[in-house]
């Protein structure tokens, strides 16, 4: 077991991949709890698709793909916030419209450019094993910035989630809190997309948080548990993919393996809590 854990870390690319997925797991766990509290799961889906045209345009002009993703991702949440403040427009409808429009623009851009197929595959499924030092530093900066931002306004965000009327009565700027959370969610999704791809990035945010909600009702505990599950689940997933490929000649997609591990943890937690609830109910009846 010791060799199974340590052996992959001897390869430089695996060390970078493990650090990347641990950072993303920590970030996703912290942000994901607030996403679940505010029921913003669909927002993560919208963001992961609205960054598509930004990445495509950046590729077409030879610019940084991260910059393109940041511009369109943050622009989408700002536009969404502006639309949501209009009472005549339903928030879900606004997200659906942005989802369709940004994705369509991305498809149009891609259809006009050649040589994008390989990068499109990486965009969809990620390249966690190809993470370089620069990307690792960028992810670390995003993770630290987002976690610090959440920590500063954690109490306000929790109050906003459970009692928006009370938060407004106490003078908290709800619009600014919503905007801050939306931007943090966008940054977390964008950071995950580069390593995990648009298909899998959201799982790093939603799955650990959903698991933590099964295990505790306290928001602070949920954030700690979700961050731990995200980081360890990512590490274990990469180790399993490495071991299967190197020692058993079975090729497993690293990003997908990470998601499978996180989902297995969620399933185990769901079963365990269900059994525990039934046992306690029977004891109460007896």
Short names for language-model regions:
Residues 33-116, 212-227, 240, 244-251, ...:
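Short loop segments and helix-boundary regions at transmembrane helix junctions
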Residues 6, 244, 251-286:
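Cytosolic-side transmembrane-helix boundaries in multi-pass membrane proteins
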Residues 1-26, 285:
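Membrane-interfacial amphipathic/re-entrant helices at transmembrane-helix boundaries
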Residues 24, 136-208:
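Helix-loop-helix "hairpin" substructures at the membrane interface of multi-pass membrane proteins
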Residues 20-29, 50, 54, 58, ...:
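Alpha-helical transmembrane segments in multi-pass membrane proteins
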Residues 4-14, 87, 91-155, 183:
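Transmembrane helix-bundle core of multi-pass membrane transporters
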Residues 14-23, 39-48, 66-71, 81-97, 136-141, 171-177, ...:
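Hydrophobic alpha-helical transmembrane segments
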């Amino acid at each position: 077991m010791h060799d199974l854990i340590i052996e992959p870390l001897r390869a430089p690319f695996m060390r970078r991949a493990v650090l990347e997925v641990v950072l993303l797991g920590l970030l996703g766990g912290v942000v994901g709890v607030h996403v679940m509290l505010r029921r913003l799961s669909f927002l993560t889906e919208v963001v992961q698709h609205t960054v598509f045209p930004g990445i495509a345009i950046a590729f077409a002009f030879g610019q940084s793909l991260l910059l393109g993703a940041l511009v369109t991702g943050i622009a989408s949440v700002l536009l969404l916030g502006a639309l949501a403040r209009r009472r005549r427009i339903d928030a879900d409808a606004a997200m659906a419209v942005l989802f369709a429009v940004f994705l369509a623009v991305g498809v149009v851009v891609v259809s006009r450019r050649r040589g994008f197929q390989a990068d499109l595959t990486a965009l969809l499924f990620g390249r966690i094993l190809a993470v370089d030092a620069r990307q690792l530093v960028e992810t670390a900066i995003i993770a630290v910035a987002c976690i610090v931002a959440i920590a500063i306004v954690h109490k306000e965000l929790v109050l906003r989630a459970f009692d928006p009327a009370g938060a407004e009565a106490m003078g908290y700027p709800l619009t600014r809190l919503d905007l801050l959370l939306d931007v943090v969610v966008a940054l977390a999704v964008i950071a995950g997309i580069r390593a995990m791809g648009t298909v899998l990035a959201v799982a790093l945010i939603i799955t650990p948080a959903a698991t933590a909600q099964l295990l505790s009702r306290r928001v602070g505990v949920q954030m700690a548990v979700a961050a731990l599950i995200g980081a360890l689940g990512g590490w274990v997933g990469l180790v399993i993919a490495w071991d299967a490929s190197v020692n058993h000649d079975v090729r497993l997609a690293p990003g997908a393996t990470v998601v499978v591990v996180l989902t297995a943890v969620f399933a185990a937690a769901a079963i365990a809590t269900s059994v525990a609830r039934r046992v306690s109910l029977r004891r109460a009846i007896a």
